[in-house]
């Protein structure tokens, strides 16, 4: 069955659907030797040859690919880009290496924001989770500096005008602090550039700390250190897929990796046991010879 080229490439982890549409429009993709056009359809067969910038890439049928999702604790100071000309650290630097696919960030966090950032190997999943029409909730813990009164909170809930259109917090809840340094938990259902900061600035309040603590129903994992990542299990992955109307997965890499770690641990234990037996035998032999 044929599928849109950008969908096949997104599913294979070569970028979000929006990114892939851009590289197709730029003439950087060829199918069986012909420059591809936006809207082209392909059927994934063993003989299919797709190239990006002249490099042959790997694509597989939907049923052959396992969708993987990581939860990453982004520290402040890291950029949401694959490569930085100035050599600054990026969110991709610490992620596990992949063969035949790549990690795609589900949205962005600005350099001064820390917290939960999801990554997936499925570009279609990333695209749908980011799209405003899906209205997936993002929750942030915000420390603000300035006087916050009921009128400002009312404006933030009802909506204020930003340079790229009206915006509002879906929910806003006081969560601690005293005087002019206070913490709030806020939620949005879209991911415009610096939207949380710009909303507060629109009512004359500065954000001094910003942490994303939840995406949909996936929280920032407890105990995860900054710069650390953990892979979501099958139930969590399928929650995200069903949230954006994608078919559920039937298997997960998480179980496979756990089995591999268990086998490795067993191998180490057996090796240690053999070493102990050999060493013990040598010691015993040494005493008998004496």
UniProtKB/Swiss-Prot annotation:
SUPFAM superfamilies: Alpha-L RNA-binding motif, Pseudouridine synthase. The keyword Membrane does not apply. The lineage of its organism: Bacteria, Pseudomonadati, Pseudomonadota, Gammaproteobacteria, Enterobacterales. The gene is rluB. SMART domains: S4 (SM00363). Its EC number is 5.4.99.22. Belongs to the pseudouridine synthase RsuA family. It is an enzyme of class 5 (isomerase). Responsible for synthesis of pseudouridine from uracil-2605 in 23S ribosomal RNA. This is Ribosomal large subunit pseudouridine synthase B. Pfam families: PseudoU_synth_2 (PF00849), S4 (PF01479). InterPro entries: PsdUridine_synth_cat_dom_sf (IPR020103), PsdUridine_synth_RsuA/RluA (IPR006145), PsdUridine_synth_RsuA/RluB/E/F (IPR000748), PsdUridine_synth_RsuA/RluB_CS (IPR018496), RsuA_PseudoU_synthase (IPR050343), S4_RNA-bd (IPR002942), S4_RNA-bd_sf (IPR036986). It catalyses: uridine(2605) in 23S rRNA = pseudouridine(2605) in 23S rRNA.
